[in-house]
Amino acid sequence: MLNKTSILDFLSDNKLLLRERFHVEKIGIFGSFARNEEGPESDIDILIELESNVTNVFDLKWSLREFLKNQFQREIDICNTKHIKPFAKEYILKDAIYV
């Protein structure tokens, strides 16, 4: 069953792969899964920080989204912490759970 624990376990168990393949320095979840409020149609909200030398951010985010979508069989929204809009930052970060 897909829930907060199973998502966080997968992300934690695959930190090295995520770093090597997608240049992810930090990863976690926020939103409905982080709050245990997910429903059958809920997407998974992923919060990332990429290595500072990354130049192909769009391509990496797209590839990571597809990788996680295939793993979890859910839609994936990825938010880079460096690009959070000011009005949403507090709301997003208060729910964030990093691995």
What spans do the regions from the language model cover?
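Hydrophobic alpha-helical positions that pack around
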Residues: I29
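Short, aliphatic-rich beta-strand segments
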Residues: D43-E49
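Catalytic core of pol beta-like nucleotidyltransferases
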Residues: M1-K26, A34-P40, E51-V99
